[in-house]
Swiss-Prot record:
A GO cellular-component term linked to this record: plasma membrane
Family, as annotated: Belongs to the peptidase A8 family.
Family matches, as NCBIfam families: lspA (TIGR00077)
InterPro entries assigned to the protein according to its UniProt record, in alphabetical order: Peptidase_A8
EC number(s) given by UniProt: 3.4.23.36
Active site residues according to the UniProt entry: 126, 145
Gene coding for it: lspA
Annotated protein name in UniProt: Lipoprotein signal peptidase
UniProt-annotated location(s): Cell inner membrane
Keyword entries, A-Z: Aspartyl protease, Cell inner membrane, Cell membrane, Hydrolase, Membrane, Protease, Transmembrane, Transmembrane helix
Catalytically driven reaction(s): Release of signal peptides from bacterial membrane prolipoproteins. Hydrolyzes -Xaa-Yaa-Zaa-|-(S,diacylglyceryl)Cys-, in which Xaa is hydrophobic (preferably Leu), and Yaa (Ala or Ser) and Zaa (Gly or Ala) have small, neutral side chains
Domain of life of the native organism: Bacteria
Length: 171
């Protein structure tokens, strides 16, 4: 049921943030795809942070990357469905739900950025590499992944905040 306090378009104005995430994501992927060769590393902060180029045909942490290609379309379908749900959710938000609107817009922008890669390129371009002393590496990721993660953390925090505010006060 639509939220009457949302107005006609709800919080769809926050789609500018999704577009900004998408543009920055695609611009950085294009830059690193052209500037680096596969798995080349440029150390930015020794022992902690590097630029690299990696292609991920799977999902997070290369989940199902060894599939025969069907996973590309499965993850694309999931991204399309999730994106549609996020737009509807964003539209139904009230004016006072800015935190949630930002969270949804970040997740949406990231999902569309990776969806574009998956459909057009057949893989997601990753280029950010965080590591500890060249021994312990976190899987490479990109701006879209970062936006999705920040948005998901914001959603979780919002759920905890909402749940806490609904708890009855005990004397």
């Amino acid at each position: 049921m639509p939220n009457p306090a949302a107005g006609r378009f709800g919080r769809l104005a926050w789609l500018w943030l999704s577009l900004l995430v998408l543009v920055i994501d695609q611009a950085t992927k294009l830059y690193f795809n052209n500037a680096l060769t596969m798995y080349q590393q440029i150390v930015v902060i020794p022992d902690y942070f590097s630029w690299t180029l990696a292609y991920n045909t799977g999902a997070a942490f290369s989940f199902l990357a060894d599939g025969a290609g069907w996973q590309r379309w499965l993850f694309a379908l999931i991204a399309v469905v999730v994106s549609a749900v996020l737009v509807v959710w964003l539209k139904r938000l009230g004016r006072n739900e800015t935190w949630l609107a930002v969270a949804l817009a970040l997740v949406l922008g990231g999902a569309i950025g990776n969806l574009y890669d998956r459909i057009v390129l057949g893989h997601v371009v990753d280029f950010i590499l965080v590591h500890w002393q060249n021994r312990h590496y976190f899987p490479a990721f990109n701006v879209a992944d970062s936006a999705i993660t920040v948005g998901a953390v914001m959603l979780a925090l919002d759920m905890f905040k909402s749940k806490k505010s609904e708890d009855p006060v005990h004397d």
